[in-house]
Amino acid sequence: ENFVLQTPAMIPLAGPANRQARICADNLAGDRKEYHGTMGTSVAKVFDNTAAVTGANEKTLRAMGMVKNKDYYSVLISQKSHAGYYPGSTVLHMKMLFGKDGRLFGAQAVGPDGADKRIDVIASVMRSHGTIYDLEELESAYAPPFSSAKDPVNMLGFTAENILTGLVSFISCAELDELSPASRPAQDMTILDVREEIEFLEYHIPGSVHIPLGKLRGRLDELDKNKMTAVICSVGIRAYNAARILMQNGFGQVRVVEGGINFYKSQHFRDFEKELHVIPAEIPGCPLDMGKGRS
């Protein structure tokens, strides 16, 4: 049985199989025990990356007839595997699915380092019937070589709460791609990049408007309040702050691009490779985005 969805499921994993065998042996010996299902928590090594999952994915929820932003919500973040100012940190992409009551449906993580650790933590919370609010309060071991003061798991909880309370709305990279430059929705949307100039020169979405976050309040008149504004930065913290500024100044349709430029580039790596010849050898990262996310 699927522990999350309470539906029949076949999940051929060694861990659940061994636990079932133990329960079977206990019952044969006269000890009454029950198996309460599996969440399908698993991990795989894919060249230099690790991919880990637990619970249901979005494809499964849709197949059950569930509707996004009604029956379930999703959050996607790009974080550092540990504090960005400590050498060796890598980008970790994480996605989580949850209900309007904060119930956790599942999560996925991909990155060179730290994916298995975070999924194990989320799986433990899910097994205890925890919610996004438990992720917010989760206290994990912290030191710069190992994590950030706000761990990526905490950031998932913070961002999920922001969604449920209406502080932020997101647009996915896939939804951006569906809007071709000639389409009516694209004409009615502004992609606002709030990173610094050197970051914008390194790589940006074609057709996007560049206004650094620090200059946004003084340049609001350059943006059309009647258009949807999709805000993007490196990982999300500056885009979230920019979105709040816009919303507080009368912009009614504001979205933050999920995962930021870091995730967008991972989905458009061929476009990024074409521009490598114009990228300086060293591009300093912005301290605002190091080891942080939306909060």
Q: Model-found features: residue ranges?
A:
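A short, polar/charged loop-to-alpha-helix boundary motif
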Residues: 113-132
